[in-house]
C-alpha cells in the first residue's frame, strides 16, 4: 500500500496512475492469464458532497474552499485503509472491497465505484493529504507500507492549475482560474508542505512530454 501525495498541480495523480499501469503491463507479460496486480485509488471520492458543504455554518466559504482538508471525509478514508490492512487469508473467498470515485459532471462522489479485488498486490492511493501530519490523516498514513511525496515549485503548480481549471470548466478564463489557484489550491499546498510527515520517497516533478510513454 503506497500513498502518493503532493500539493495541487504537483503531478501526483499522473504518477500514481502510470505506476499502476506499468506494473500491470509487466505483470501481464510474465503472467498473461493473471488478473492485474496493481490498482490506483484516487482520494477524490472522499470529498464531502455539495449537500454536506451546504449544511456547514458558512456554506459559501465551504464551497469556495472545496479541496481544503476540512472538505474531505478522512474518517471514511481511514476506514477503507484499515479494512485493506487486514490480513488476507484466502484470495478466492475474500470479497471485493469498493472505494468511492468522483463524478466531475455532477461534482459529487459516487459510492462503491472503484473495485479493489483481493488479487490486488500493489495499491497506489493518491491525494493531497495522504502524508499530512494531522489526525486522522496521519493514522491512515501510518498504515501504509510507503509514503511518496511529489515535490514541485509553487509557480509551476500555479501554471498547471490555471490550465487545468480552464480546461475542466471550473473557471471561465485564466484570470478566474489563477484566482482560484492562489486563493484555494496553493493555500492548501502550504498546509500540505508545512505539515508533511516523513516520507520514504520524494519525487521531483519536472516537465517532460516524453515521460510516461
Where are these regions (language model features)?
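Walker A (P-loop) phosphate-binding loop of P-loop NTPases
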Residues: 9
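Conserved lysine of the Walker
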Residues: 12
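Hydrophobic positions on the alpha1 helix immediately C-terminal to the Walker A/P-loop
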Residues: 15
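Short hydrophobic/aromatic beta-strand immediately N-terminal to the Walker A/P-loop
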Residues: 1-3
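Post-Walker A helix-loop "phosphate-sensing" segment adjacent to the P-loop in P-loop NTPases
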Residues: 21-38
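ATP-dependent NMP and nucleoside kinases share a basic, alpha-helical "lid"
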Residues: 106-164
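NTP-dependent small-molecule kinase module
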Residues: 162-170, 180-213
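Conserved nucleotide-sensing/catalytic segment adjacent to the nucleotide-binding pocket
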Residues: 39-42, 46-106
Amino acid at each position: 500500500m503506497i500513498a502518493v501525495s503532493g500539493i495541487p498541480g504537483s503531478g501526483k495523480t499522473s504518477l500514481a496512475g502510470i505506476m499502476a499501469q506499468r506494473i500491470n503491463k509487466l505483470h501481464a507479460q510474465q503472467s498473461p492469464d493473471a488478473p492485474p496486480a496493481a490498482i490506483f485509488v484516487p482520494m477524490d471520492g472522499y470529498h464531502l458532497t455539495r449537500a454536506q458543504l451546504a449544511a456547514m455554518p458558512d456554506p459559501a466559504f465551504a464551497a469556495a474552499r472545496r479541496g481544503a482538508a476540512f472538505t474531505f471525509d478522512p474518517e471514511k478514508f481511514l476506514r477503507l485503509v484499515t479494512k485493506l490492512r487486514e490480513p488476507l487469508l484466502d484470495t478466492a473467498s475474500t470479497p471485493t472491497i469498493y472505494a468511492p470515485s468522483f463524478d466531475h459532471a455532477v461534482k459529487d462522489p459516487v459510492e462503491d465505484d472503484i473495485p479493489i479485488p483481493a488479487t490486488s498486490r500493489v495499491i497506489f492511493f493518491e491525494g493531497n493529504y495522504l502524508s499530512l501530519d494531522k489526525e486522522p490523516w496521519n493514522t491512515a498514513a501510518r498504515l501504509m507500507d510507503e509514503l511518496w511525496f511529489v515535490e514541485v515549485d509553487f509557480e509551476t503548480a500555479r501554471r498547471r492549475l490555471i490550465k487545468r481549471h480552464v480546461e475542466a470548466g471550473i473557471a471561465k478564463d485564466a484570470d478566474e482560474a489563477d484566482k482560484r489557484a492562489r486563493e484555494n489550491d496553493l493555500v492548501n499546498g502550504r498546509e500540505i508542505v508545512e505539515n508533511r510527515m516523513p516520507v520514504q520517497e520524494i519525487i521531483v516533478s519536472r516537465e517532460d512530454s516524453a515521460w510516461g510513454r
